[in-house]
A protein has these predicted regions:
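Sec-dependent bacterial lipoprotein signal peptides
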Residues: 1-26
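Conserved hydrophobic/amphipathic alpha-helical signal-anchor segments
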Residues: 27-97, 102-107, 137-153
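Short, hydrophobic/aromatic-rich segments at coil-to-beta transitions
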Residues: 112-117
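Short loop/turn motifs at secondary-structure junctions and domain boundaries
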Residues: 119-123
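Short loop/turn microsegments at loop-to-beta-strand junctions
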Residues: 125-127
Length: 153
């Protein structure tokens, strides 16, 4: 009798555990959308090209939007297609707030460490995407944004 009770307990535990594992993927999907949106934003390839510019110009950041756009255009259509980019100008516009990104050029950019090089003007829902010259994009609230970009307007 005792053996039968143990088998029943084990069977119930196995069922509950399996149901719990099945529920995990669907229960934690909220952050996945934000992460996917961040990774697919125009800001990521823009920041990667910015970092490549620094790497190919002895640590000097681009002096202007024109200089960065010319550098990106020179990469060629195959390189751009790798980022799903067909129009260089579209890289400079946020798909979330439909405004041009603020990009730090010349003396405003500090190469040599992973530093913020571009960010959304307004963002969405009280958060903004910011990017560093390594191509990392983060979604931050206003307080964290002010810490990371103290001179922002």
């Amino acid at each position: 009798m005792r053996n039968l009770a143990w088998k029943s307990f084990w069977g119930v535990g196995l069922c509950v555990g399996t149901l719990g594992l099945c529920a995990l993927p669907s229960g934690c999907g909220g952050g996945r959308h934000v992460s996917q949106e961040r990774e697919e934003s125009n800001l990521k390839p823009l920041a990667i090209f910015y970092g490549r510019f620094i790497g190919q110009h002895r640590g000097r950041p681009p002096a202007s939007e024109k200089e960065l756009k010319e550098f990106i255009q020179a990469a060629g259509t195959k390189e751009l297609a790798g980022f799903h980019v067909t129009d260089v100008d579209s890289l400079f516009i946020s798909s979330r707030d439909q405004k041009p990104y603020v990009v730090l050029y010349g003396n405003d950019a500090r190469a040599g460490k992973a530093t913020v090089v571009a960010y959304e003007q307004e963002g969405k829902g009280g958060t903004r995407f910011i990017a560093n010259d390594l191509g990392n994009v983060q979604e931050v609230d206003e307080a964290h944004f002010r810490e990371m970009v103290p001179g922002a307007q």
